[in-house]
From Swiss-Prot:
Similarity annotation: Belongs to the HAK/KUP transporter (TC 2.A.72) family.
Protein's name according to its UniProt entry: Probable potassium transport system protein Kup
One Pfam family this sequence matches: K_trans
Keyword Ion transport: yes
Organism: Streptococcus agalactiae serotype V (strain ATCC BAA-611 / 2603 V/R)
Chief location category: membrane
C-alpha cells in the first residue's frame, strides 16, 4: 500500500478515487453477499418474510450505514487524524497524555479489531464460493458443502502464502476490480428493484423502527445483530485513512453507499417477487440471471479476496503500530513492498491463517459463520467512541456536545453489542476467546515494561567519564573495537542503564576510541525521522537519541551511518584512521554493536503479581524477534550479552564452611 502524499491529503483525484475503492471498502463492500441472507434465514426463510419485514430490514440497514458509517466515521472520526494517519492506535496517540487509563480502550479496541480480522476472510470467501451452488453446470459438485470448504481453504492458503511477497503489481488491479464490483452492485440492484419499486420507501426510518417492535419480526431487537453485518467495515475505513487520504474517502463513500443500498433494495425486491423460491437460496446470487451467475461468482470471489487482503494488511499495520508503541511483543517484520506502508509479520500471518481456517472447518457454512460475526467489532466501535470523545474535548469542542455524541453513539453501539451478544453461544465465543488472548498478551507486555522501568537501576554517565577516558588509554588492555555501540531502551538525560556500564567496565573492560549510547524514542507522529546528539563535552562519548515515528522502521545501523557522516563533516567527531579498507578515503573505524539480552531471574524480590507478569513476559519473549533483526543489524558486527534484569541487589545466600574436625566415638 502506498501512503498518501501529505500535500494532497484533503484533496480528491480520479486515481485516488479508484485506489480508495480497492483499499478502504473491501469489508463493507462485500457485506451484501451475506447480510440479507442472514436476515432472511433468521426469519425462517424466504417464504416467511413479508413486505413490511423487507422494508423494515432495508430501512434499518440504510440508517445504520448513515448513522455509524457516514456520520460517526466519515464526518467525525476522519477529522481525528494523527499526522494524516487513522485507526484506533493513531487515535490513542492523540489523546494518551490526557489520562493514563485511555490505554484500556485502546488495548481492548485493538484486540477486538485484530480478532475480527481473522473472521472476515472466512466469511467473505466462503460466501463467495457458495455462490457456485447456483451455477447449473457446477451444482452437482458444490451442493456438497465439503467441496465448498475445500475450495475456500485452497483460496485462503494461497492468499496467506503470497503475503510474504507483498501485493506489488497485483495491488494496482484492486481498485479497478472493486470499481467494477460496486458498479455491478448498483446496476444489478437497481434493475432488480423495478420488480417492486416500493422497496425505495425504506429510506423512511419509520419502517425500520416499526419492524423492531413488530410481532412479524421473529427476532425482536436481536435482528440488529444481522443488521450490523452491513456496517462492520466502518472501522477499517477509518484505519485506512493514511493510505488514501480524507478527500478521496469523502468523494468515494457516496458512490459506495449508493451502490450498497441499491444492492440491498434489489435483493429485497427479488425476495418479494419470488416468495416461493427455496429457503436455502442466497438472495444475492439467486437474484442474478442464470446466464451471468458464473461471471458474478468469479467477480464476488475476487472482491472477497481483495476484502480479505485489506483486512490482513490492516492487521499487519495494526500490530506494527502496537509494537512501536510498546504495547505488543516485537515480532519479526519484513517489508516486501517498495514503500513503508507495506509490512509483513510472519507470526501474525500464520496466526490469522490458523484461526481463519479453523473457523471455516468449525462452522462449515457462511450462515453459521455469520452467527459469530460482528460481536467483536461492536466492542471496537465502542472503544473508538470513548477515545473519539476525548479527542473532541482536546480540540475544544463544547463538553455538552461531546457528551451528547458519546451518549448517542454509546447507546446505539451498546444496543448493537447487546443484539450481537446473543451470538456468543452460537459461535461468537470464538472471536471473544481470540480477543481475550490478545488482550492478555498486550497487557502482560505493557505491564511488564512498566515494572522494569519502575525497578531497574540507572546510573549517571557523568560519573563514569573519567573511567572511560582512562580505559581508552590503558595499554594493559587490547583495543576491543574502534567504536562500541550500545542500544538501550532506557536513557533519560545523562542517566543510563546500570547493565551497560557493568558490560563496559566489569565483565571484561571494553577499550574503544568512541563509546556510543543509542536510544530510540517512538513519537506520536507516524513518519518522524530525527536525532539529537550529546557528546557530554568529550570527543569519545556520543549519546544519540533517535526520534522515529511509530510507523518507521527501526533500522539503527543505517540511521547511525548518516549521523556518523554528519558528525565527521562538522568536526565534532575526530577522524578515525583506517589502515585497511576497500574505501581508501574512509575516515571511520570499525563498529561493534552490543545488544544486552535482559533475562528475568525468578530469584528477584518482586510481589507475586509482578513476578507472574515478568514470568509471562519472559515466556512470550521466546517468540519475538531478536534485537538484531528488530534493529536491522543482521549485516553488522554484533555481540549479544545475557544480563539479568536487576531489580534489587542480589545478596549471597547463607552458607557455612564445613569444619574438617569430626567427632568420632570410642
Amino acid at each position: 500500500m502506498q501512503h498518501v502524499n501529505h500535500s494532497s491529503f484533503d484533496k480528491a483525484s480520479k486515481a485516488g478515487f479508484i485506489i480508495a475503492l480497492g483499499i478502504v471498502y473491501g469489508d463493507i463492500g462485500t457485506s451484501p453477499l451475506y447480510t440479507m441472507q442472514s436476515l432472511v434465514e433468521n426469519q425462517g426463510g424466504i417464504s416467511s418474510v413479508t413486505e413490511s419485514f423487507i422494508l423494515g430490514s432495508i430501512s434499518l440497514i440504510i440508517w445504520t450505514l448513515t448513522l455509524i458509517t457516514t456520520i460517526k466515521y466519515v464526518l467525525v472520526a476522519l477529522k481525528a487524524d494523527n499526522h494524516h494517519e487513522g485507526g484506533i492506535f493513531s487515535l490513542y496517540t492523540l489523546v494518551r497524555k490526557m489520562t493514563p487509563w485511555l490505554i484500556v480502550p485502546a488495548v481492548i479496541g485493538g484486540a477486538t479489531l485484530l480478532s475480527d480480522g481473522a473472521l472476515t476472510p472466512a466469511v467473505t470467501v466462503t460466501s463467495a464460493v457458495e455462490g457456485l451452488k447456483v451455477v447449473p453446470s457446477l451444482q452437482h459438485i458444490f451442493q456438497n458443502q465439503s467441496n465448498v470448504i475445500f475450495a475456500t481453504l485452497f483460496i485462503l492458503l494461497l492468499l496467506f502464502a503470497i503475503q510474504r511477497f507483498g501485493t506489488g503489481v497485483i495491488g494496482k488491479l484492486f481498485g479497478p476490480i472493486m470499481f467494477i464490483w460496486f458498479a455491478f452492485l448498483g446496476i444489478s440492484g437497481l434493475l432488480n428493484s423495478f420488480a417492486h419499486p416500493e422497496v425505495f420507501k425504506a429510506i423512511n426510518p419509520y419502517y425500520g423502527l416499526k419492524l423492531l417492535f413488530s410481532p412479524e419480526n421473529h427476532k425482536g431487537i436481536f435482528i440488529l445483530g444481522s443488521i450490523f453485518l452491513a456496517t462492520t467495515g466502518a472501522e477499517a475505513l477509518y484505519s485506512d485513512l493514511g493510505h488514501v487520504g480524507r478527500g478521496n474517502i469523502h468523494v468515494s463513500w457516496p458512490f459506495v453507499k449508493v451502490a450498497i443500498i441499491l444492492s440491498y433494495c434489489g435483493q429485497g425486491a427479488w425476495i418479494l417477487a419470488n416468495k416461493n423460491a427455496g429457503n436455502e437460496l442466497n438472495p444475492f446470487f439467486a437474484s442474478i440471471p442464470s446466464q451471468f451467475t458464473m461471471h458474478v461468482v468469479i467477480l464476488a470471489t475476487l472482491a472477497a479476496i481483495i476484502a480479505s487482503q485489506a483486512l490482513i494488511s490492516g492487521s499487519f499495520t495494526l500490530v506494527s503500530e502496537a509494537m512501536r508503541l510498546k504495547i505488543f511483543p516485537q515480532f519479526r517484520s519484513t517489508y516486501p513492498g517498495d514503500n513503508i506502508g507495506q509490512t509483513y509479520i510472519p507470526v501474525i500471518n500464520w496466526f490469522l491463517f490458523a484461526i481463519t481456517t479453523s473457523i471455516v472447518l468449525l462452522f462449515k457454512t457462511s450462515a453459521h459463520m455469520e452467527a459469530a460475526y460482528g460481536l467483536a467489532i461492536t466492542i471496537t466501535m465502542l472503544m473508538t467512541t470513548i477515545l473519539l470523545s476525548f479527542f473532541l474535548i482536546q480540540k475544544g469542542v463544547k463538553r455538552g456536545l461531546v457528551l451528547l455524541m458519546m451518549i448517542f453513539f454509546g447507546i446505539l453501539e451498546g444496543i448493537f453489542f447487546l443484539a450481537s451478544a446473543v451470538k456468543f453461544m452460537h459461535g461468537g465465543y470464538v472471536v471473544v476467546i481470540i480477543a481475550v488472548a490478545i488482550i492478555f498478551i498486550m497487557t502482560i507486555w505493557y505491564k511488564g515494561s512498566k515494572i522494569v522501568s519502575r525497578y531497574v537501576k540507572l546510573l549517571d554517565l557523568k560519573d563514569y567519564i573519567g573511567q572511560l577516558d582512562k580505559l581508552r588509554h590503558d595499554h594493559r588492555y587490547p583495543i576491543y573495537h574502534t567504536n562500541v555501540v550500545y542500544l538501550t531502551n532506557r536513557m533519560e538525560e545523562d542517566m543510563i542503564d546500570k547493565s551497560i556500564m557493568y558490560s563496559i567496565l566489569d565483565k571484561r573492560p571494553k577499550k574503544a576510541q568512541v563509546y556510543w549510547f543509542v536510544n530510540i524514542k517512538v513519537t506520536d507522529e507516524p513518519y518522524t525521522a530525527e536525532y539529537k546528539v550529546d557528546m557530554m563535552g568529550t570527543d569519545f562519548i556520543v549519546k544519540v537519541e533517535l526520534y522515529l515515528g511509530f510507523k518507521m522502521r527501526q533500522t539503527v545501523s543505517r540511521y547511525l551511518r548518516t549521523i556518523v557522516e554528519e558528525l565527521l563533516e562538522s568536526g565534532r567527531l575526530p577522524k578515525q584512521g583506517k589502515t585497511y579498507s576497500v574505501r581508501p578515503d574512509s575516515n571511520v573505524g570499525d563498529f561493534r554493536f552490543i545488544v544486552l539480552d535482559e533475562r528475568f531471574s525468578s530469584s528477584q524480590n518482586l510481589k507475586p503479581g509482578e513476578r507472574f507478569v515478568m514470568l509471562m513476559k519472559s515466556s512470550i519473549k521466546h517468540w519475538t524477534a531478536t534485537p538484531i533483526r528488530w534493529f536491522g543489524l543482521q549485516f553488522s558486527e554484533v555481540t549479544t550479552e545475557v544480563v539479568p534484569l536487576i531489580f534489587t541487589a542480589n545478596r549471597g545466600l547463607p552458607i557455612k564452611e564445613k569444619s574438617e574436625l569430626t567427632t568420632t566415638g570410642d
